[in-house]
Each structure stands twice: as C-alpha cells, then as structure tokens.
Curated annotation (Swiss-Prot):
Region (Disordered): 44-156
Pfam families: Clathrin_lg_ch
Annotated InterPro entries: Clathrin_L-chain
Extent of Polar residues compositional bias: 147-156
Keywords: Coated pit, Cytoplasmic vesicle, Membrane
Family: Belongs to the clathrin light chain family.
Lipid bilayer topology: Peripheral membrane protein
Bias type Basic and acidic residues, positions: 89-115, 124-146
Protein's UniProt name: Clathrin light chain
Name of encoding gene: clc
Main location group: membrane
C-alpha cells in the first residue's frame, strides 16, 4: 500500500466498536468486552464454519452444533471477570488522588471565603470610623462658625465670607482657576455694597 505522503510502510490499525467484530477473523470465538469501570466480560460466539455447512438444515441442532458453552446476553446476565490487579491499583490510587484534590480545593475555597468576609468586615469598620470622624469634624466646624457669627467680631458679612476662604492658596492645574472669584470677594470686603 502506498502512502500519498511518500511513506511505503504504513501500518493500518483498526479499533473495534461493540458490534463491529467480524466473527470470521476470530480464532477461538471468544470476544472480551471492557465496561467503563475496567471490568472485562468474555462472551462466546458461534462457530461460522458449522453454521455454513448446515445452513440448509433448519434443525435447531445445526444452529447449536457450533455453540460451546452457555450464551450470555448483553442485557446484564454476564458475569464480570475480576479486574486486573494493576488496573484496580491504578483506580484506587486515582480515586484517592481525586479525593485529596477535592479536599484541598474545598479547603482553599473555605479559606478564600473567610478572607473575603474578614476583608469586608475591615472595610465596613474603617468606613464607619471615617464617617464618624468626618461627622465630628463637621460638627466642630459648624460650632466654630456659629460662635464666630454670634461673637460679632466682623462688622459686615463680607469680612466673615473672606475669613472662610484661603486667600493664599495657589491655583491647582487640576481644578478650575478661582483667582477671579477671590479677587471679587476681596473687593467686596474692602468696599461693601450698601
């Protein structure tokens, strides 16, 4: 057989799927099936040479003449063979590894959940502390403003307005330029509108 890619010796392998076995190719008539758990089943097939010799004879004896042993149906009447020790050892080892992996994964998950809860608790406690401090600072500032306004130190309101702002602050490029507003407030303080 020639290969389109230039290799002369090409080995052809076939995989048999259940039901695809050619009984003429079997030597001893036994077929071994392996289920998903690694348990193998062995079934016996009919001898085709005897069936072909007696195919004109409709007697049941000719049908059963090539049959050696009892026929096991695929419906589940088969008796499972013992799993090979190496396969059993591998399956046990694999199962243990999967259980350990699952256990470690669950431990990591619980650890992440605990860390997330702790992080949320810290965030909320810091937030509450900041809110309380800001509230206290605002109350103190309002009290100082009230005492200044009731003390009567200023003769008119524009002086009190100018005292609330920082006249020495330099303009910040990120913020709007407030130099014009400061200039207006200083003029009003010096020459109040009557």
């Amino acid at each position: 057989m020639s290969d389109p890619f230039g290799e002369e010796n090409v080995e052809i392998t076939e995989e048999f799927v259940e039901g695809d076995i050619n009984e003429n190719d079997l030597i001893d008539g036994n077929v071994e099936y392996v289920d998903g758990n690694g348990i193998s089943f062995e079934t016996t097939t009919f001898d085709n040479s005897n069936n072909n010799n007696n195919n004109n004879n409709h007697n049941n004896n000719s049908y059963n003449s090539g049959f050696d042993g009892d026929l096991s149906s695929v419906d589940g009447d088969m008796k499972p063979k013992e799993t090979a020790p190496a396969m059993r050892e591998y399956l046990e080892k694999h199962e243990k590894e999967m259980q350990e992996k699952k256990k470690k994964s669950e431990e990591k998950r619980q650890k992440k959940i605990a860390e997330a809860k702790q992080s949320l608790d810290n965030f909320y406690s810091e937030r509450e502390a900041k809110k309380k401090t800001a509230l206290k600072n605002n109350r103190d500032h309002n009290k100082s403003l009230e005492t200044d306004s009731t003390s009567g130190n200023t003769t008119h309101t524009w002086e009190s307005v100018v005292s609330m702002i920082d006249l020495q602050a330099k303009p910040n490029p990120a913020n709007k330029d407030t130099s014009r507003m400061r200039e207006i407030l200083i003029r009003l303080k010096n020459q109040p509108i009557v």
